[in-house]
């Protein structure tokens, strides 16, 4: 994605039915998705900021999210409410998602896209 031209990036996102992505700046490209496509956002443990939910709503893209289970980094030991903790101890850490959770959510998301975008009932 980082090496794509602007035009290629727009075409890529416009052709998607479902985008599955870890929370991050690249999710802003949902503005190029066709209405009733979907974004499924994966959050690291304890991360709760839903800016892409609002963006999806504004551009007519369906939205789903799940949050990984895990622990905060040691960056949060001193002050769990600090920005340092929020960014380095929570947001910017690797995380692992439960495959069963993703599978369950994807079945719902795909059904919703097919139903709302293509008017097909699975």
Predicted regions and their residues:
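N-terminal targeting/anchoring "stem" of glycan-biosynthesis enzymes
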Residues: 1-122
């Amino acid at each position: 994605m980082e090496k794509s031209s602007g035009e290629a990036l727009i075409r890529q996102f416009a052709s998607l039915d479902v985008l599955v992505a870890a929370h991050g700046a690249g999710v802003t490209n949902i503005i190029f998705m066709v209405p009733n496509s979907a974004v499924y956002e994966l959050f690291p443990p304890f991360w709760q900021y839903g800016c892409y939910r609002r963006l999806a709503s504004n551009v007519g893209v369906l939205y789903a999210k799940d949050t990984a289970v895990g622990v905060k980094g040691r960056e949060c030991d001193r002050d769990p409410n600090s920005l340092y903790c929020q960014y380095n101890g929570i947001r910017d850490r690797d995380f692992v998602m439960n495959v069963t959770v993703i599978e369950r959510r994807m079945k719902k998301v795909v059904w919703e896209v097919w139903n709302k975008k293509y008017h097909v009932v699975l």
